[in-house]
Amino acid sequence: MVLHDNSGSAGFKRCSVHFGPFTLAVVSVLYACLITSALGGTDKELRLVAGQTKCSGRVEVKVQEEWGTVCNTGWDLAAVSVVCKQLGCPSVIKATGWTNSSAGTGRIWMDHVSCRGNESALWDCKHEGWGKHNCTHQQDVGVTCSDGSDLEMRLMNGGNRCSGRIEIKFQGQWGTVCDDNFNLDHASVVCKQLGCGSAVSFSGSANFGEGSGPIWFDDLVCHGNESALWNCRHEGWGKHNCDHAEDAGVICLEGADLSLRLVDGVTKCSGRLEVRFQGEWGTVCDDGWDSDDAAVACQQLGCPTAITAVGRVNASEGTGHIWLDSVSCQGHESAVWQCRHHEWGKHYCNHNEDAGVTCSDGSDLELRLKGGGSRCAGTVEVEIQKLIGKVCDRSWGLKEADVVCKQLGCGSALRTSYQVYSKIQATNTWLFLNNCNGNETSIWDCKNWQWGGLSCEHYHEAKVTCSAHREPRLVGGDIPCSGRVEVKHGDTWGTICDSDFSLESASVLCRELECGSVVSILGGAHFGEGNGQIWAEEFQCEGNESHLSLCPVAPRLDGTCSHSKDIGVVCSRYTEVRLVGGNTPCEGRVEVKILGTWGPLCNSHWDMEDAHVLCQQLKCGVAASIPGRAPFGKGSGQPWRHMFHCTGTEQHMGDCPVTALGASLCPEGQVASVICSGNRSQTLYPCNSSSSDPESSVVLEENGVPCIGSGQLRLVNGGGRCAGRIEVYHEGSWGTICDDSWDLDDAHVVCRQLGCGVAINATGSAHFGEGSGPIWLDEVNCNGKEPRISQCRSHGWGRQNCRHKEDAGVICSEFMSLRLISDSSSETCAGRLEVFYNGAWGSVGKSDMSATTVGVVCRQLGCTDKGSIRPAPSDKVENRYMWVDNVRCPKGPETLWQCPSSPWKRRLASPSEETWITCADKIRLQEGTTNCSGRVEVWHGGSWGTVCDDSWDLNDAQVVCRQLGCGLALEAGKEAAFGQGTGPIWLNEVKCKGNESSLWDCPARSWGHSDCGHKEDASVKCSEIAESKGSVKAAGHSSTVALGILGVILLAFLIATLLWIQRRRQRQRLAVSSRGENSVHEIQYREMNSCLKADDLDLYNSSGLWVLRGSIALGFRLVTAAEAERHST
């Protein structure tokens, strides 16, 4: 076999050694290439020899394994700088011909070296070529560098460590720096080196006093980015033509005692600019003072928007120093004194040229569009510090308009225009946007905008229509704030499909049109069919936006839509409330204006909390009482049936959640009333409780003196405000009522007093649990017509012979409850949705039922925050009573009762109309070593509990693992394998088949029915184990180690492969010798153009032969003898 050598492969060492045996050749070549690729280093080195420190000596270079010297022809400080940096001794002390020490021997590798100073290695500099020179070793160069450990710097006579005369310690002696050519770049290096921040100023002429000793530096050349002053270019240590009268000094930011303030302005962000320097305040001259300078000053003062740069015309005159003159900022500086300026205190000004600024912190800046039909179209109007102005169209273009639209969150500009005003109307304050590039996020970020009493030629006001411009209206309604929804986009009005408009979107629409809250949304062209455009977009409002144009939109997903599906909305303003029929403005019948019509409010849900908010809104103090029997008259028209859910802390009725109970009639004469404390809010007294007669607490009210406290009622433990154990407030504490003689007439009075309709059931024997504290009333005997329980006959306050096991309760007609009915006893968070109202259970219709509404139901039931609607079981065929349909909850309500719906009316409905819900499961694994192992715990009835291991097997475990997304079940653990839990044992005798989607689908005993202890808690181990708790990922190895490991693996694999090939070839030769030489071609090996990089190797098997392949030209391959013969010829 022959190994052919071909050189010329870029980036590789030449492989020229010939090998005989095939296997040894391949292994050697691969190993050499892998090692070369892994090391990838240079064969040149640099050192200093015969010096007194590691950073000084004769310069020697190692080339081709041989050390040699460098000739001093052309040798300068730039070359010395390269050597010092390369050796990690970046400070140049001096360059020298190394004649004061022994000369070098052997090669002189470099001559005529010419460096720029920024090279990373000496051999990167230009030179004659390796070994080319006309020198002797008497011309060998040397250097003296420093790593900085033997150099020090300090500032003297400045009063602190960050200001003063510059002094440097070199070779054990302190010396100064000459001020020749010293500037702010030099000062910046000094301040940075000393950790004193940026340079504020520099000085010469021994401003901080004359030093003594050597003058170490003169004519320094710094760029400002050097890490130390001695790294700047210089003539050499101690070389100068100065005396100490020229000693340089600096003042750094950390030692400058600098401050900035505004004086004599009308706001905290305006006024004359003053700077404190060296303990004294002074002004800034307005020479060259412009908007860039003002922008830096405003930013520094925490008022980031510069409105005007005030000069001599407007700024008041200061006194004392004029510290700065000819300030010239770029706009990006963090402080005014970082801008270019004359030396501190040098100026050519008087105080009538003092500079000032008018800035803003953003709180007094506003941008808006007016008169365009929506917030995203119209005339551009700005308000700056309470002064309103327009934008002049003289410099108005699409770029400026784009910035306006962007700032308002209205997309991009579709078109610009202008509004022409007469000269009489043109006394506006104008804003000129002179130089927006379109990329700004705010018009205040545009450069060189001008504001104030400027003249706008032709009196044109800029206008814009933005891409998000959507102007809504309601059309076809009988009253204002109701009708078909139409939206104007661009110049075109169009309708919205009823599948593309949610309750949240309707809420935003009502708010934008100043129509209060949404009452209902009606599909099917309820307000008549529109014509023309139907917008093919779905509004995706969250509900808290102020305008429809702020809501995201998405393309419609359900195909085409016709005008027969135009959406309509009915809004209502609950915020207009009044009291009518009383002797004072602070008492009377409660009337609410809804849909433009005033009407009395039904008192079936009116309570003291609602009354408190109403009195507060009307500035009538607090609610003293809510009398029944319509003492202020019934009013005209049918009372509104809306229910307010005030907590008593709101400032306005419009802040309270509202339930619209639809069109069912209010009981005759049940009109809400209130007596507020009015001007006597500070003189309210508790009702007289000294008498044993409950009637005494009412006498004050009937005599016209409002009282609070005794006789207040509440219902406890009933699941709602209109059912529960009765508790009455007296003498500062709550107590119960005994059930002796307790009947439906007594219960009627309680329900009426609480605004809960009529009594359905009068309960006794502590039906709603035993109370605590006093038992205030016994033998209550009402005739059913009293307005308050305290007006009924009884034994008197506190006179009783009862115990709390006799506490009375009530269920009123307005009590509402919620449940899910399922055939499975283990399912409490899934089933048919039912509500309890007016004493009877009924189902809820599924029309318009959304995921948000389902979430409210699940949360109200204490299940989870999410759920889904499921089909009704096919075996359910009987009709049942339904209470309500079209329930559509927005985001926010805590109960179903706060969601708009169709009117509440009991009717028969088929199972296909009913709502069936499954609330999202809550299951977890505890105490496991991973997220997919541990004790099984389930959430039920508001608490976590465990599962008993009776009948627990791998099928049950499989369902749990699947439910948690943890793959296959590996083990069904028993006997508290992961420790004993606490709390309830919710499930027992679980018997899954293994294919169920959740544990709740498996047969089991009823919830909480168990004969187990926690020592029998069930557990699981699943296959898809999540990252172990507390695990830490190991840090990655270095690339060199990784490459080395890769090389070893490849090499081992290659050796094994090639040994196999060799054995196979030997067997083939034996076969050839037995059948004749011409049966098989001889195999030869030849090298191609280059060795391979280790990361270019790719081994694959093709037609039974192993071939090495890379991303470059193949390094070698297997060829037949015939191919080798053609190659050799």
Swiss-Prot record:
Where is it predominantly found?
membrane
Glycosylated residues are 100, 118, 134, 225, 314, 439, 544, 679, 688, 761, 931, 995
Q: What does this protein do?
A: Involved in clearance and endocytosis of hemoglobin/haptoglobin complexes by macrophages and may thereby protect tissues from free hemoglobin-mediated oxidative damage. May play a role in the uptake and recycling of iron, via endocytosis of hemoglobin/haptoglobin and subsequent breakdown of heme. Binds hemoglobin/haptoglobin complexes in a calcium-dependent and pH-dependent manner. Induces a cascade of intracellular signals that involves tyrosine kinase-dependent calcium mobilization, inositol triphosphate production and secretion of IL6 and CSF1. After shedding, the soluble form (sCD163) may play an anti-inflammatory role.
**Keywords of the record:** Acute phase, Cell membrane, Disulfide bond, Glycoprotein, Inflammatory response, Membrane, Phosphoprotein, Repeat, Secreted, Signal, Transmembrane, Transmembrane helix
What SMART domains does UniProt report for this protein, alphabetically? Answer: SR
Residue spans, topological domain Extracellular:
41-1039
Gene Ontology CC, one term:
extracellular region
Q: Which residues form the SRCR domain?
A: 46-146, 153-253, 260-360, 367-467, 472-572, 577-677, 713-813, 818-920, 923-1023
UniProt topological domain (Cytoplasmic) ranges: 1061-1129
Provide the species name: Bos taurus
PTM notes: A soluble form (sCD163) is produced by proteolytic shedding which can be induced by lipopolysaccharide, phorbol ester and Fc region of immunoglobulin gamma. This cleavage is dependent on protein kinase C and tyrosine kinases and can be blocked by protease inhibitors. The shedding is inhibited by the tissue inhibitor of metalloproteinase TIMP3, and thus probably induced by membrane-bound metalloproteinases ADAMs. Phosphorylated.
Membrane spanning residue stretches: 1040-1060
A biological-process GO annotation: acute-phase response
| Bilayer topology | Single-pass type I membrane protein
> What is the official name of this protein in its record?
Scavenger receptor cysteine-rich type 1 protein M130
Point out the annotated site residues (description: Cleavage): 263-264, 275-276, 327-328, 354-355
